[in-house]
Amino acid sequence: MRVILLGAPGAGKGTQAKFITEKFGIPQISTGDMLRAAVKAGTELGIKAKSIMDAGGLVSDDLIIALVKDRIAQADCAKGFLFDGFPRTIPQAEALVTAGVELDAVVEIAVEDEEIVQRIAGRRVHEASGRVYHIVYNPPKIAGKDDITGEELVQRKDDTEETVRHRLSVYHSQTKPLVEFYQNLSAKNGGKPKYSHIPGVGSVEAITAKVLEALS
């Protein structure tokens, strides 16, 4: 099962990725992990990527695609793989097609922006223990205080409304167009890869059931 999972930051992709990889026995592949592994292993591509990153440059799509082809040829990808946060842009998606990388399914987990803002901006964290609360869905017994220690809860910088809205605007301009790209690709190729749009609201179990049904 060769899968791409699409969706905005905070849509719940991480949770669903875990269920998919366990169910199908496939690895979750992110470009970040892939780059780090190639650099660590000192492969030819890894050395190239490291020199670019050390100079503060952006790794080109050509190099990313070469790394992807390398990665999916490894033994743990025999049953397939799940791409996490890749492709991010239309040129990357087109390069994947040109490189002959076949996909079985593209699953979009769709959640409205306002719901995502509420989900993420409502998070509060007890830094020392890592305990996470939510002012609406999982509030502490006393507002702003950790249940166990009574210490102050904080909002992570990444979780502020301003940061979340910025990340969403980047997603809409760069990654959202992939939805249309894969819908068109599927229509053109007689339903391959199979494209599924799944609303990411409701219980985790209900969303997982819909995701697994889409992949069956």
Swiss-Prot record:
Classification via Gene3D superfamilies: P-loop containing nucleotide triphosphate hydrolases
Keywords: ATP-binding, Cytoplasm, Kinase, Nucleotide biosynthesis, Nucleotide-binding, Transferase
Gene Ontology CC terms, in alphabetical order: cytoplasm
Catalysed reaction equations from the record: AMP + ATP = 2 ADP
Cellular compartment(s): Cytoplasm
Alphabetized GO MF terms: adenylate kinase activity; ATP binding
Pathway: Purine metabolism; AMP biosynthesis via salvage pathway; AMP from ADP: step 1/1
GO annotation terms (biological process): AMP salvage
Protein residues bound to AMP: T31, R36, G57, L58, V59, G85, F86, P87, R88, Q92, R156, R167
InterPro entries, A to Z: Adenyl_kin_sub (IPR006259), Adenylat/UMP-CMP_kin (IPR000850), Adenylat_kinase_CS (IPR033690), Adenylate_kinase_lid-dom (IPR007862), P-loop_NTPase (IPR027417)
Domain-level remarks: Consists of three domains, a large central CORE domain and two small peripheral domains, NMPbind and LID, which undergo movements during catalysis. The LID domain closes over the site of phosphoryl transfer upon ATP binding. Assembling and dissambling the active center during each catalytic cycle provides an effective means to prevent ATP hydrolysis.
Similarity comment text for this entry: Belongs to the adenylate kinase family.
HAMAP family for this protein: Adenylate_kinase_Adk
Subunit structure: Monomer.
Protein name per its UniProtKB record: Adenylate kinase
Organism this protein belongs to: Pseudomonas fluorescens (strain Pf0-1)
